[in-house]
Amino acid sequence: MAKDLQVTTSKVNDNQTQLTVKVPVEQIQNKVEGRIRNVAKTAKIDGFRKGKVPVSHIRAQYGAGIQQEVINDVIRDTVFEAIKAEDVRAVGMPNIDDVKLEDEFLVYQATVEIFPEIKVEGMSDIEVERHTATITDEDVDTMIENLRKQRQEFAEKEGAADEGDQVTFDFEGSIDGEKFEGGSAEDFKLVLGSGQMIPGFEDGIKGLAAGEEKTIDVTFPEDYQAENLAGKEAQFKINVKKVEEAKLPEINDEFLELFGVKEGGVEQLKTDVRKNMTREIKNAARNQVKQAAFDALLEKNEFDVPSAMVDQEVDRQRNLMMQRFAQQFGGNANSIDKDMLPRELFEEQAIRAARLGVLVSRVIEENDLKVDQERVETFIKETAENYEDPQEVIEYYTNDAQQRANIESVVLEDQVVDFLLEQGKVTDKEVGYQELLASQQQGMM
């Protein structure tokens, strides 16, 4: 810590601490004088040769500004030393105020938000429902049918559009007779039953054939993302140009080769599909029970988190969504207007994530949990199995310290889940494959 730095702390509230920092005024004066002399050596001022400007002239003309610069630098250099010296677990940047230059000290106050000091309660009272699933032959057949649908092609048909058909049409929307932005399109393609449009839109198209027109009445949902449209009644004029029905590919050698099956025919495809589904439900089951355990832990521990932690989590979630948008639609994530993703979209989940982060950290500290390196190695190997060259992936995670640290963090979080399940009451429930996947997704929302 800087020489002769004096620090006292006082609690503002459960999430804030205030530090009063005193820096000997001699340190300020010495820095100011040193900087004035340096300026005098290089200053170009009319009437003086370069380097010959009297120090007294620099002090008189620039001294106040130089002193303020030095004070700002000293505060910046000492505030984090003070935080560290007082063992304050700060989150976010400190807020500096009440800066005073007294006869003996530069005095300032730094208010910082702090990591919540809580004791985890109710672990033995946690009740968790753990979902398990067994993959049936019917599940495998359904998955293969879905693989066929993913590669389906559409062929033009005569007659009315029905569920599963792809319809190409123009539409023009209006509210109270006035067109609105984004309410019109030409040659729009829609697979009926996809749920892509607002309620009532697809139903209005069913039964129409190519060349037919219709005006349909719909109501935008109350929670529609465009607030200016939410809850509004609208009319859409539809002009159907083409109706196509789906044609599923046959399960032949060509289809099998798409999935790397060169020998063994359909039975080998079923074996491979079952293997992938087994891995999928293993991950889904783990995620479901993790979310259930964390939800139960959050319910037993009510506390507020610093706004800085929530802000950081909002930024993290927003950046992830921007990256997903860029990957899905092309372009650079940095080019996406953040105003399109307002804070309100993320705040509820951000608060939950921040609170959960505190609880997980406290469970680890209170129970002295250490990362299990054997589990880390197993995690790396299982991850590597999904790649073409597993050994290369293993070496990557083994040799890259940051990547290994990320995996250790994931594994340690899994160990926290195991610890919670050991402390609480767990009830197993057998569910179907699709239900397990759905319960996992619900928990992640």
From Swiss-Prot:
Domain named PPIase FKBP-type: residues: 164-249
Membrane-spanning segments: none
Subcellular location(s) per record: Cytoplasm
UniProt keyword annotations, A-Z: Cell cycle, Cell division, Chaperone, Cytoplasm, Isomerase, Rotamase
Domain of life, per lineage: Bacteria
EC category name: isomerase
One Gene Ontology CC term in the entry: cytoplasm
Catalytic activity field: [protein]-peptidylproline (omega=180) = [protein]-peptidylproline (omega=0)
Family: Belongs to the FKBP-type PPIase family. Tig subfamily.
Protein name: Trigger factor
